[in-house]
Curated annotation (Swiss-Prot):
Keywords: Cell inner membrane, Cell membrane, Membrane, Transferase, Transmembrane, Transmembrane helix. It holds the Pfam family LGT. HAMAP family: Lgt. Belongs to the Lgt family. One of its GO terms (cellular component) is plasma membrane. Catalyzes the transfer of the diacylglyceryl group from phosphatidylglycerol to the sulfhydryl group of the N-terminal cysteine of a prolipoprotein, the first step in the formation of mature lipoproteins. This is Phosphatidylglycerol--prolipoprotein diacylglyceryl transferase. Pathway: Protein modification; lipoprotein biosynthesis (diacylglyceryl transfer).
Length: 296
């Protein structure tokens, strides 16, 4: 078993100012996205659409607003609506954590639609350009989660080479034991807990870095190297992210205040299913539209 390093959440101390790793990872993610965008400017079919470096800078401004506002509102509405309706001022306490990818995705989509309207472009043309830039930010965000030792995975067999002990999960581990006696006996978890006061868990943040970050990045970047029907790159992002998130959720610990929902699926999985379906529908539409235009 591997023990999580339990990093200091503060990366840099600048006098009274503390720069946290999670915030720093957001910055790294946005910078990486800009770099990817500028690399894509060199592709002939991208250059033919008239994209410029200034467009990327402007899109990132909209993207930051969409990510922060959408991510926070998504967390409030999708995950803890009852609490925040009772404590509305706590919505603004972003330093206490609480961001939702699916909310951030909706926020960024709306922001890109606004950008497209201002630049008189079709919004799918904008999202097709942006989509390959997103996975780098997702990977950076999940790395921030791992450094913070949060959003850990479900309890697993201690003999698994990837099993990890998270100090931040001690309280959850103690509460988990009496609820799962069959697994405690099967995996000899009582002995593990007596020795470490922790239980082995999946490092699901690393799984997300691999699938939502690295694999999705290469899939999108390579797919978008050639000219595709408008909407196809956006569709691949929806399908790819939805499938990656849906898969990883089987190893990720559900939110304790929600648990598992209908059919034994988590909130993250239920929010990912519409993304997958929308992606498939958009992909079919994109290629049928190109075929119809070619036949006309």
């Amino acid at each position: 078993m591997i023990i999580h390093p339990n990093f200091d959440p503060v990366a840099i101390h600048l006098g009274p100012l503390a720069v946290r790793w999670y915030g720093l990872m957001y910055l790294v993610g946005f910078i990486a996205a800009i770099v990817v965008g500028r690399i894509r400017l060199k592709l002939p079919h991208v250059a033919a659409q008239g994209w410029t470096a200034k467009d990327i800078d402007d899109m990132m401004f909209y993207g930051v607003l969409g990510t922060v506002l959408g991510g926070r509102l998504g967390y409030v509405l999708f995950y803890k609506a009852d609490f925040y309706f009772s404590h509305p001022l706590d919505v603004f306490k972003v330093w206490e954590g609480g961001m939702s990818f699916h909310g951030g995705f909706l926020g960024v989509t709306l922001a890109m639609m606004l950008f497209a309207w201002q630049r008189k472009r079709h919004w799918l043309q904008v999202t097709d350009f942006v989509a390959p830039m997103v996975p780098t930010g997702l990977a950076a965000g999940r790395l921030g989660n791992f450094i913070n030792g949060e959003l850990w995975g479900r309890v697993t067999d201690p003999s698994a080479p990837w099993a990890m002990l998270f100090p931040g999960a001690m309280r959850d581990d103690a509460a988990w034991l009496p609820k799962h006696p069959e697994l405690v006996e099967k995996w000899h978890l009582a002995d593990v807990f007596m020795q470490y006061q922790m239980l082995p868990r999946h490092p699901s943040q690393l799984y997300e870095i691999a699938l939502e970050g690295i694999v999705l990045f290469f899939a999108l970047f390579l797919f978008a190297r050639k000219s595709r029907p408008m909407g196809a790159v956006s569709a691949l992002f929806l399908i790819g992210y939805g499938l990656a998130r849906f898969t990883v959720e089987f190893a990720r610990e559900p939110d304790d205040f929600l648990g598992l929902l209908a059919l034994g699926l988590s909130m993250g999985q239920w929010l990912s299913l519409p993304m997958i379906l929308a992606g498939v529908a958009l992909m079919v539409w994109a290629y049928r539209r190109r075929a119809a235009n070619a036949a006309a």
